[in-house]
Swiss-Prot record:
Pfam hit, one: RuvA_N
Region (Flexible linker): 144-147
Keywords for this protein: Cytoplasm, DNA damage, DNA recombination, DNA repair, DNA-binding
Family listed: Belongs to the RuvA family.
Gene: ruvA
Subcellular location: Cytoplasm
Protein name: Holliday junction branch migration complex subunit RuvA
Domain of life according to the entry: Bacteria
Amino acid sequence: MISRLTGKLVEKNPPQIVIDVNGVGYEADVSMQTFYNLPPVGESVQLFTQLIIREDAHLLFGFATAEERKTFRQLIKVGGIGAKTALGILSAMTADELARAVAEEDVKRLSSAPGIGKKTAERMVLELRGKLVAHTVTDGLFAAAPAADETEDIVSTLLALGYSEREAKAAVKGVPEGTDVGEGVRLALKNLLK
């Protein structure tokens, strides 16, 4: 498995790039988000990668961050979404934007990505709910990835009780870090009832 490449960027032709690693040129497809963040040709670059092996080809996909690669891996697990479609989605929106769209069940936003219709967008919401986490705080609803397993367990419990992911994450913000799951759920429910 090729997990990461560090070398000199020798070619940039969207969506493909070539990185020279000790005399071996690795061709990788990258999202446009990654492509626009690449340095000029001739400079050093590091890419996180995902190798997809099919009967007829070995395909290497590159990502600027490990988080983008993780999101790609989640996307290709969704029925009806292949590697090229997943790359198209990550070209249309950042990993954080995708996580927010899934959490908010924004089917319209998801179906605006190339190759994604309404049914596939609905399937994405269903299959990715709770698996993607936004890592930037923009509207006060999303914080960094949960700091402890307890936080994830509290959110999961609230989801099982029928609350939306958005409500659950907002409620958990008022729970002190390190609180055990039982007490955390109680405090989160109290926050929801305010």
